[in-house]
Swiss-Prot record:
PROSITE patterns: TLDC. Residues 71-81 have a biased composition (Low complexity). Its main location: mitochondrion. It is found in: Mitochondrion. This is Oxidation resistance protein 1. Residues 91-320 form the TLDc domain. Belongs to the OXR1 family. Residues 1-14, 40-49 have a biased composition (Polar residues). GO terms for cellular component: mitochondrion; nucleus. Residues 51-69 have a biased composition (Basic and acidic residues).
Length: 323
């Protein structure tokens, strides 16, 4: 047994042949997770990476660098709203409202730059069953294929042989979401985003996940600052502005979506729904509920306890492709 004298910092003993006079210095290697764990156990006061660990393992991403990285991402492409007829007069969705909703969607759905109108009270008539039918992805896909130009016999045979049932399964897994927009008798706009298509449930079972949220677009008059002149104050008072509010899933309960042949309910606690509309698609009510921690959707008053409303317009938009 001999001591490695070529490396003064090394105090370990190594086995060498009798004729070997020099030991190779240890190879510098990247510390493993186990190495770092052992160091932390020997130094209980150190709960974070040391400076040497940061140099070896690469720079740690802090909040500032993360913000710079996110701000450097390219902006989303211009959104296109498809489905309005030229004769449709009461259009509930505009670019500004769509952009506000889009910014809160899951990242995979924000990338879609086309939204498709699935159901409109004005264009498709007043019927809850029609809303359910048109929100079904299978029905939407059949309508899409029906409107496609016909292909030759050979192309259709090859396409069916290559796709088969595999494509059918994939189509159902494509990312989709739906935006519901309601306009009441006071011209207030509000609604929800749901991650699944609306459908009648035979049993009382909630569906949907934490990506769902409620929203409202309300008019308000901004309070003028003290530095404003009387002319500026009067102009502010005369020009109400639109304020968009969203109420995200709180996780308190899983009562996200429930729908049947009599009503649609979004969010529920203590027998009260964040948004509820009846089978006539005319009467509705909004309560504050634990599911979303929301305000009354059709009221600008923060102390309102219940918000009954009449539906003057209703639209359902699909975000995501069918094939």
């Amino acid at each position: 047994m001999v001591t490695d004298k070529t490396n003064a910092s090394s105090s370990s003993l190594v086995d060498t042949p009798a004729d070997e006079t020099e030991v190779q210095p240890p190879i510098n290697r990247r510390p493993t997770f186990l190495d770092r764990l052992m160091r932390r156990q020997t130094s209980p006061s150190s709960m974070e990476y040391s400076e040497s660990d940061k140099k070896k393992d690469g720079p740690m991403e802090n909040e500032q660098s993360k913000g710079v990285r996110e701000s450097s991402l390219p902006p989303l492409s211009q959104l296109s709203l498809k489905g309005y007829k030229s004769s449709t007069k009461r259009r509930l969705l505009d670019d500004e409202l769509a952009s506000n909703i889009r910014n809160l969607l899951p990242a995979r759905l924000q990338l879609f730059d086309e939204w498709d109108l699935v159901y409109s009270l004005e264009q498709h008539g007043v019927s809850l069953n029609t809303l359910y039918q048109r929100s079904n992805p299978d029905y939407q896909l059949s309508q899409l294929r029906k409107n496609k130009p016909e292909v030759g016999y050979g192309d259709s045979v090859i396409s069916s042989m290559m796709s088969g049932n595999v494509n059918s399964m994939r189509e159902r897994r494509r990312p989709q979401g739906y935006v519901l927009i309601i306009k009441d008798e006071n011209n207030s706009k509000f609604g929800c985003f749901v991650n699944e298509h609306l459908r009648p449930m035979d049993q009382k079972r909630y569906y949907g996940n934490g990506e769902c949220f409620l929203w409202k677009s309300e008019l308000f008059t901004p309070s003028p600052s003290n530095s404003n002149s009387e002319e500026d104050i009067s102009s502010h008072l005369a020009t109400p502005q639109i304020r968009f509010k969203a109420f995200m899933y709180t996780g308190i309960n899983d009562n996200i979506i429930y729908s049947n042949h009599d009503f649609i309910a979004i969010g529920s606690s203590k027998g009260q729904n964040g948004l509820w509309i009846d089978r006539s698609l005319y009467n509705g009510v909004s309560y504050s509920c634990d599911t979303f921690g929301n305000e009354i959707l059709n009221s600008n008053s923060g102390d309102a306890k219940i918000g009954k409303f009449k539906i003057m317009g209703l639209e359902l938009w699909r975000v995501g492709t069918l094939e």
